[in-house]
């Protein structure tokens, strides 16, 4: 059975707690989109855990956790997160944690670009409230085909991978030097970084799509864990104040690598009052439009608010359920 858990506001709805409860009866928990811009908080007898990349099910010893195809993975952050929870007595091994070979690597320059661009925008008062963890830049380079996937770490000795690395680095050095006046990065340093990540994570990398498909066919209980909420969805959120991935439940099987499967259950999580991390309008402000008042002087934000009000939260909820 497949259950998808997603947020139907701006994130921070409490999905981590819900998934932790569902994981008690699950065999597998899968994150299918986003990166380490998530912040799922779970409190157990072992302490308080704030999980940015690891699925919430990692705290359950009999649950297998997967970072699937639709993810962008900051491997340095993941290494630190694994070390942190191991220090609290949580086991993380290739038997209970798997990385998709198709997941995108968040390269070292993605965080640098994100930080520099957010600083530049902040000087003009138009910053997006980015987490500065390189998520947008990792997804951008995914669609430009100018980054690596985790499976590429298996083939760093292959000439075609080395040529791709050199080509990527040349382009990034032009961007960083031309736009932000940064010192160029060297190819030997980049290759050494990739080799270091490969040494640590090769045992975890596999065809997770095949693994999940086989597990479902054998009757395993699976939970899909979304990051953020519908109002941060790249297509259905309040653009441009969105994340860079598809957060709704309908994308869950695609991002998980099992695109032919439909969730048996969809759990939409919300809380009684609205909060969000980052810049952009909150849904309650749309009430001002009904009273003829202008909640914000910026036309772009007004347009986004009107579009959101017209679409309606009900439409987003139908999208989550796959009935729209």
Residues of each region from the PLM?
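Non-transmembrane, aqueous-exposed alpha-helical and coiled segments at domain scale
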Residues: 1-324
């Amino acid at each position: 059975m497949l259950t998808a858990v997603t947020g139907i506001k701006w994130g921070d709805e409490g999905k981590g707690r819900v998934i932790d409860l569902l994981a008690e009866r699950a065999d597998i928990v899968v994150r299918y989109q986003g990166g380490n811009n998530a912040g799922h908080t779970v409190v157990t007898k072992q302490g308080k855990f704030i999980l940015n990349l690891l699925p919430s099910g990692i705290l359950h010893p009999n649950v297998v956790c997967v970072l699937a195809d639709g993810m962008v993975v900051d491997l340095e952050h993941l290494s630190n997160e694994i070390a942190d929870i191991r220090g609290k007595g949580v086991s993380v091994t290739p038997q209970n944690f798997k990385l998709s070979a198709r997941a995108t690597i968040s390269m070292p320059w993605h965080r640098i670009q994100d930080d520099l661009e957010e600083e530049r925008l902040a000087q003009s008062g138009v910053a997006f409230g980015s987490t500065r963890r390189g998520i947008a830049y990792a997804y951008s380079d995914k669609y430009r085909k100018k980054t690596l996937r985790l499976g590429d770490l298996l083939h760093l000795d292959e000439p075609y991978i080395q040529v791709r690395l050199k080509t990527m680095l040349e382009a990034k050095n032009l961007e960083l030097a031309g736009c932000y006046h940064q010192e160029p990065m060297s190819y030997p340093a980049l290759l050494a970084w990739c080799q270091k990540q490969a040494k640590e994570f090769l045992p975890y990398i596999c065809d997770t799509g095949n693994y999940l498909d086989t597990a479902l066919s054998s009757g395993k209980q699976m939970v899909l864990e979304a990051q953020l909420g519908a109002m941060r969805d790249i297509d259905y959120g309040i653009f441009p104040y969105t994340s860079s991935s598809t957060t709704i439940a309908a994308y869950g099987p695609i991002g998980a690598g099992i695109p032919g499967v439909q969730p048996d259950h969809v759990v939409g999580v919300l809380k009684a009052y609205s909060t969000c991390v980052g810049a952009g309008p909150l849904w309650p402000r749309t009430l001002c439009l009904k009273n003829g008042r202008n909640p914000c002087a910026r036309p772009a934000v007004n347009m986004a608010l009107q579009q959101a009000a017209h679409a309606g939260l009900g439409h987003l909820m139908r999208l989550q359920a796959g009935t729209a």
